[in-house]
Amino acid sequence: MAPPTCRLLSAALVLLLLLATNHQATGAVVASELRCQCLKTLPRVDFKNIQSLSVTPPGPHCAQTEVIATLKGGQKVCLDPEAPLVQKIIQKILNKGKAN
């Protein structure tokens, strides 16, 4: 092979590898977003320790409703959305939001 052809082939191969790597990385992000975040749930947590609460309805990413509480220490815990205490916590937060 002539040197210009070899350089062109090398450049094309490098470009192809970069595109393949970029495509794989992008696919990995999508795949990780399309699954449930809560593998284990807690039936209760002290209301005073909750900094914020996120409720994610069922969708293509996960068949269950997910309730994720961020505690004042920064730790995130998954709560059981069917637990009576968790439902009371959600109602308290909703009522607190309506009062403001």
From Swiss-Prot:
Keywords: Chemotaxis, Cytokine, Disulfide bond, Inflammatory response, Secreted, Signal
InterPro entries assigned: Chemokine_b/g/d, Chemokine_CXC, Chemokine_CXC_CS, Chemokine_IL8-like_dom, CXC_Chemokine_domain, Interleukin_8-like_sf
Domain of life (superkingdom): Eukaryota
Keyword Disulfide bond: yes
UniProt xrefs under PANTHER family: C-X-C MOTIF CHEMOKINE 2, SMALL INDUCIBLE CYTOKINE A
Annotated family: Belongs to the intercrine alpha (chemokine CxC) family.
Subunit and partners: Homotetramer.
Protein's name according to its UniProt entry: C-X-C motif chemokine 2
Originating organism: Mus musculus
Taxonomic lineage from the root: Eukaryota, Metazoa, Chordata, Craniata, Vertebrata
